[in-house]
Amino acid sequence: RSAAAQLRWADTASPSRVLLVCGSARNDGNCPGEMSKTFRLLEIARETLEQAGIQTDVLDLSLLSSEYGRKIHPCKGCASTAMPLCNWPCSCYPNHALDQTNDWMAEIYERWTAAHAVIIVSPVYWYQSPSPLKLMIDRLVCADGGNPDPSATSGKNPGKAKALEMAGWDYPQHLAGRAYGLIVHGDVAGIEDARRALSDWLDWMGFIDAGVQARLDRYIGYYEPYATSHDSLDRDEAVQEEARNVARAVAKAVVELRAGRLQAVQPNLSRPRPK
């Protein structure tokens, strides 16, 4: 499925697609009782992209907290044994003996692969990304150097994986060449560090940032009560427009990317240390 998604991504006749990731754990289908500000900002970005003729795909990670059986299992850290032991896409699940089944990542890998760009919208939880978002990030390690051929290591054979890496591994970047934008918001502290962590991660994986206006971090209702935070977002028309600008910047980047012009201004340099 990921291979088919890669073909759709590369097909110049296919529609331009942007994956919108809602990183919040909060929604109106469980204990919080109301939608997140993150989802509202994502909807602003989605509407802007669709007005620009971009096909959108909304990946709402808050469903992990509100849908029965919805799971992203944790990364097992195969890459730290040897990079070729980590498969693209991940082959660690399902593990029926441990009841590690129904892994959402099997679908999520395909959705990332098919997208020409991604916009991640996320709140700050304790200076960091929320756990649903971090689970997905960790499981995407296989996109940066992962082995697309599990048979090369006879499945999960550490010795064979180590031998492959020592013989020379090129650490293929399976999602490189896609554009990205970020919207990170908080109420008291941590927005810049959280946004930089996401930027650094995507840069490392070979994504291309869509420009300074595509990387947004803002406080909404700074030191105001949580109970009125949606009112604060209602009043903050500037941050709503900035969210639209993130989407506009990404939409323009996708056009340039698919025409080959965005890559043309990127330095095509070999990495002396590709890990």
Residue ranges of each PLM-predicted region?
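Short loop/turn segments at strand-loop or loop-helix junctions that form parts
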Residues: 20-24, 218-223
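Short beta-strand elements in bilobed, periplasmic/extracellular small-molecule ligand-binding domains
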Residues: 53-60, 208-217
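Surface-exposed beta-strand edges and their flanking turn/coil or helix-capping segments
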Residues: 71-72, 195, 222-225, 261
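N-proximal short alpha-helices
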Residues: 106-109, 167, 223
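Short, glycine-/small-residue-rich phosphate/pyrophosphate-handling segment
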Residues: 131-132, 148-215
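Short helix/strand-capping connector loops at secondary-structure junctions
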Residues: 219-233
